[in-house]
Amino acid sequence: LVAAGPVADDVFDGYFSRASAGTRILNRIGNQTASEREFHTVTGSLRARGVSAVHDLGHRLRAAYLAPLLAPPSPIVLVVPCRADAFNRLRSALQSIGDTLGEPGLARTVVTVSNQDATGWQVDVDLLREYLGGQVWGIETIPYDEHLGMGIVIEHSKLAPETRAAYERVSAAASAVAEGRPERV
């Protein structure tokens, strides 16, 4: 769950457990997630506060119990670490989205390249845009930021201005998808 500011606990106590890092996890039992009503209640509460929910689905895209999270107009943000091995898996991840949700699912996908090494392999984003043009909604990049690799909760203000701006672009792209704006790569 990502929030731009504090969100009162009273809204979430009935729906979430709290991880040791302070993040909130929407209730889940076995292969059942929260009910559709719970998703709508939480989403409405977040929107009223000007913040958004982020659901990390990992590799479980095809799990039936996650279908409510993938329903239109929900944006799909596919994060790809800027490493050759991760880019080798990009094609299969996009194919999985296409196989599961069809072309409309791909059209709601924002591919986000996360640079995790200041001196490591760099992707040619223009070439990636050329390759994926017309298939996905957009492509964004997150620059390397030493704070992101620390493995702890990070204050927004501690991130480099370029990193904050990049996350704001990803957020704006996700909002545009959710609002049905048709811009694509």
Where are these regions (language model features)?
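Short glycine-/polar-rich loops that comprise or flank the Walker A/P-loop
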Residues: 21, 72-75, 103-109, 135-137
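Phosphate-binding/switch loop-helix module in NTP-utilizing enzymes
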Residues: 18-69
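Acidic-aromatic/histidine active-site loop/patch
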Residues: 2-6, 96-101, 108-109, 129, ...
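Conserved beta-strand segments of the P-loop GTPase G domain that flank and frequently precede/overlap
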Residues: 26-29, 54-56, 77-82, 109-116
